[in-house]
């Protein structure tokens, strides 16, 4: 596991989860006017520092792992990731770096990077309460896909024929995130992972809330997505983060896994110890389809 000097064992903060709807109907979000009937509930939490846990979590056992990771790509390419030449470099060189890292750590038989996101977070806690699910950072705890939407995205990413071949060939599969800070150590809105190992029957259908979208322009680039999948509260959850995370480290976690026990809800959280002068958090995540014998 990656290491760093820290005096923290845990911190406190706030995350947001789904708490039903205002009208008792199916949850919806309209991208045209930002309207929704979903109740977003703030939850005060204690967040354990992964650096001081007695046993380091692993992707194979817990579904998430903190690792050392160095890229040969200079940071300015990530900070200006929308430029065509930088996008090409990320998708060719950085994708391959992430693929090799993921296969080495997880033991995946095959791995296919398929998308990246660069996020910048400047808001404070009060401003975040006004934001929606599709801002440039995500304070709402979620998984990227579930057992309904993962096959949809897999086929959109790799093509239906190849996707179906891989699904029939391997015993299990998932979408793993390689999440890493860019430029600075994380001082604001660290990434938080939800450990639900203590809940034996945890499943996407029992502990996640489905949010149906309409008028989503991203369908053209990422394929259809029937719904977003947002966490509902359970007092048995453990919350994990890594203090003072640097660009030389990365979280690997399953944002979806065909075995729900390894699927990790996640999201940015407001750390109560955040200093007023804390720098903007910039991060990059790469999502990778992985397949296991």
UniProtKB/Swiss-Prot annotation:
Keyword Oxidoreductase appears in the UniProt entry: yes
Source organism superkingdom: Eukaryota
Transmembrane segments: none
Pathway: Secondary metabolite biosynthesis
Transmembrane found in the keyword field: no
Enzyme Commission identifier(s): 1.-.-.-
Family membership noted in the UniProt record: Belongs to the asaB hydroxylase/desaturase family.
Role description: Oxidoreductase; part of the gene cluster that mediates the biosynthesis of squalestatin S1 (SQS1, also known as zaragozic acid A), a heavily oxidized fungal polyketide that offers potent cholesterol lowering activity by targeting squalene synthase (SS). SQS1 is composed of a 2,8-dioxobicyclic[3.2.1]octane-3,4,5-tricarboxyclic acid core that is connected to two lipophilic polyketide arms.
Protein name: Oxidoreductase R2
Organism listed in the record: Phoma sp. (strain ATCC 20986 / MF5453)
Phylogenetic placement of the source organism: Eukaryota, Fungi, Dikarya, Ascomycota, Pezizomycotina
Encoding gene per record: R2
């Amino acid at each position: 596991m990656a290491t760093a000097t820290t005096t923290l064992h845990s911190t406190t903060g706030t995350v947001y989860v789904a708490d039903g709807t205002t009208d008792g109907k199916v949850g919806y979000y309209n991208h045209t006017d930002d309207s929704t009937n979903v109740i977003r509930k703030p939850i005060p939490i204690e967040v354990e520092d992964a650096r001081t846990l007695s046993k380091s979590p692993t992707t194979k056992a817990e579904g998430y792992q903190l690792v050392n990771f160095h890229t040969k790509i200079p940071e300015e390419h990530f900070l200006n990731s929308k430029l065509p030449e930088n996008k090409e470099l990320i998708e060719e060189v950085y994708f391959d770096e992430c693929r090799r890292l993921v296969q080495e750590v997880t033991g995946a038989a095959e791995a296919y990077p398929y998308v990246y996101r660069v996020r910048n977070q400047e808001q404070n806690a009060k401003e975040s309460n006004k934001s929606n699910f599709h801002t440039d950072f995500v304070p709402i705890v979620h998984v990227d896909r579930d057992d309904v939407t993962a096959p949809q995205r897999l086929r959109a990413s790799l093509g239906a024929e190849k996707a179906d071949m891989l699904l029939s060939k391997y015993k299990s599969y998932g979408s793993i995130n390689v999440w890493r800070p860019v430029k600075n150590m994380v001082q604001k809105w660290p990434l938080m992972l939800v450990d639900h190992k203590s809940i034996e029957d945890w499943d996407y259908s029992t502990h996640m809330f489905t949010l149906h979208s309409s008028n989503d322009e991203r369908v053209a680039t990422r394929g259809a997505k029937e719904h977003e999948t947002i966490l509902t509260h359970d007092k048995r959850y453990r919350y994990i983060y890594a203090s003072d995370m640097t660009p030389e480290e990365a979280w690997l976690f399953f944002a979806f896994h065909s075995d729900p026990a390894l699927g990790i809800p996640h999201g940015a959280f407001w750390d109560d110890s955040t200093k007023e002068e804390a720098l903007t958090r910039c991060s990059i995540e790469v999502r990778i389809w992985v397949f296991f014998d």
